Amino acid sequence: MALRYPMAVGLNKGHKVTKNVSKPRHSRRRRRLTKHTKFVRDMIREVCGFAPYERRAMELLKVSKDKRALKFIKKRVGTHIRAKRKREELSSVLAAMRKAAAKKD
């Protein structure tokens, strides 16, 4: 603890010391996407395409049935948070497809 104020009592009492800065734990980097993992996932997506439930969810998103799509995906993937993440992923894919189609024209 650093002696911020010259007082003998309280939180700031004691000797002046420098804080020992520790590296963040390795467990903190969990779920961070690496370049290799991203490359592999993109490759698999390109080869395999989308699952049938993902295609149906994309159709629901196309006709702006976002809530229905969320409920449908939640039923398939299990949890609300995973469903929201999947819906965001699919809507970003649709936006990219729209952008590519507009660029082509």
Swiss-Prot record:
GO cellular component, one term: cytosol
Coiled-coil annotated spans: none
UniProt modified residues of type N6-acetyllysine: K62
Subcellular localization: Cytoplasm, Cytosol; Cytoplasm
Region feature (Disordered): 9-31
Subunit (UniProt): Component of the large ribosomal subunit.
Protein name: Large ribosomal subunit protein eL36
Species assigned in the record: Oryctolagus cuniculus
Name of the coding gene: RPL36
